[in-house]
Amino acid sequence: MCKVTVPYSTIAADELHESDYVPLVNLIGIYFQIRDDLMNLQSTEYTKNKGFAEDLTEGKFSFPVVHGIHADTTNRQVLNVLQKRPATPTLKVHTINYLRDQTKSFDYTHSVLDSLEAQTRQEIKRLGGNAALEKIMDLLHVETPELM
């Protein structure tokens, strides 16, 4: 396994040190992928750009979908929808409602995103802070809906 380090070559030689950015890059990558999975199933903006719940049409085992499958292993509903790869909204809407209301997969996904965002921001801080990365995290932030 390759360890990625970035030397600060612009610093005086006596202050030269290396920082390990792998944990930060891993956190950002995981956060972004889970966020993308959630947005694909919930965001009207994603629907405009990529189509409605395209991950279901493509049969993808996204983060909320995997949670929904594991939340009730006796119910094969989500697996059946993934196998059918529906192009029309009817089955997709039903599956999204199931993931939201029955398995609470979107709530779980939001909680994981909140935790990953906090870890990412802490890692940015540990590495000395970075206004540009903090701004990116602000832009990627997903509001957790109020629980009823």
Segments from the language model and where they lie:
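All-alpha prenyltransferase/terpene-synthase fold signal
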Residues: 1-148
